[in-house]
Amino acid sequence: MSRRYDSRTTIFSPEGRLYQVEYAMEAIGNAGSALGVLAADGVVLVGEKKVTSKLLQTSRSAEKMYKIDSHLACAVAGIMSDANILLNTARLHAQRYALSYQEPIPVEQLVQSLCDTKQGYTQFGGLRPFGVSFLFAGWDKHHGFQLYMSDPSGNYSGWKAAAVGANSQAAQSMLKQDYRDGMTREEAVALALKVLSKTMDSTSLTAEKLELAEVFLQPGTGEVQYQVCSPEAMGKLLAKAGLSQPAPEA
């Protein structure tokens, strides 16, 4: 039945479904997992790298975590070429707002603007939906720390803890069970690593398979800080959480 209605994004099925949008969400389900946890003093993002071959030369740049503005970052799950287009669009929105109003763009306003773009690709002929989901982490003076999730349909919503990518339903269930209000960033990191260790396809967690980023306020100055965890620091975090063995000393 679906084959009659899935050739174009502008055609609803008799059940009221847009199959191309659903197929885009299926593409995200095959991507590496990404988690976001909202803490009292920041937001934590953790992502799983998909290393397809040991011959692949991994770049120094991030694969799952991206900075959009000084107060806003995101984790990505899905088709990276699609994500790059949307990331550039988001950065352009942020810079235009800063140029016009001389202050950082509110987090939800940027998320809504980007989701309007994504929604447009589900409504007009000759286009296909973006096969990517985002977890946005940021801070602004209006609502403090915030975590948003968006999908290919253009929908977005605010979350205390969220997961996208492979095994996201299992991860979401664990987050719902173990999350509590008022967590510190350190506790949020431990929770995210614990959930990822139980839902990843890989048998064991290693620093090379993970990316971790945090958005928090710098002590003293109160400025928003975006920080990416180094592989060395990631290894120590995994060892501290009891999720991997520390490397033997030479």
UniProtKB/Swiss-Prot annotation:
Q: Which GO terms describe its biological process?
A: ubiquitin-dependent protein catabolic process
- Keyword terms: Cytoplasm, Nucleus, Proteasome
Work out whether the entry's keyword set contains GTP-binding: no
Principal localization? cytoplasm
Pfam families membership = Proteasome, Proteasome_A_N
Q: Could you state one GO cellular component term attached to this entry?
A: nucleus
Concerning SMART domains, the annotation shows: Proteasome_A_N (SM00948)
Q: Does the keyword Cytoplasm apply?
A: yes
PROSITE patterns, from UniProt? PROTEASOME_ALPHA_1 (PS00388), PROTEASOME_ALPHA_2 (PS51475)
Q: Where in the cell is it found?
A: Cytoplasm; Nucleus
Q: What does this protein do?
A: The proteasome is a multicatalytic proteinase complex which is characterized by its ability to cleave peptides with Arg, Phe, Tyr, Leu, and Glu adjacent to the leaving group at neutral or slightly basic pH. The proteasome has an ATP-dependent proteolytic activity.
Say which family it is in: Belongs to the peptidase T1A family.
What quaternary arrangement does the UniProt entry report?
Answer: The 26S proteasome consists of a 20S proteasome core and two 19S regulatory subunits. The 20S proteasome core is composed of 28 subunits that are arranged in four stacked rings, resulting in a barrel-shaped structure. The two end rings are each formed by seven alpha subunits, and the two central rings are each formed by seven beta subunits. The catalytic chamber with the active sites is on the inside of the barrel.
The protein's name in its UniProt record: Proteasome subunit alpha type-4-1
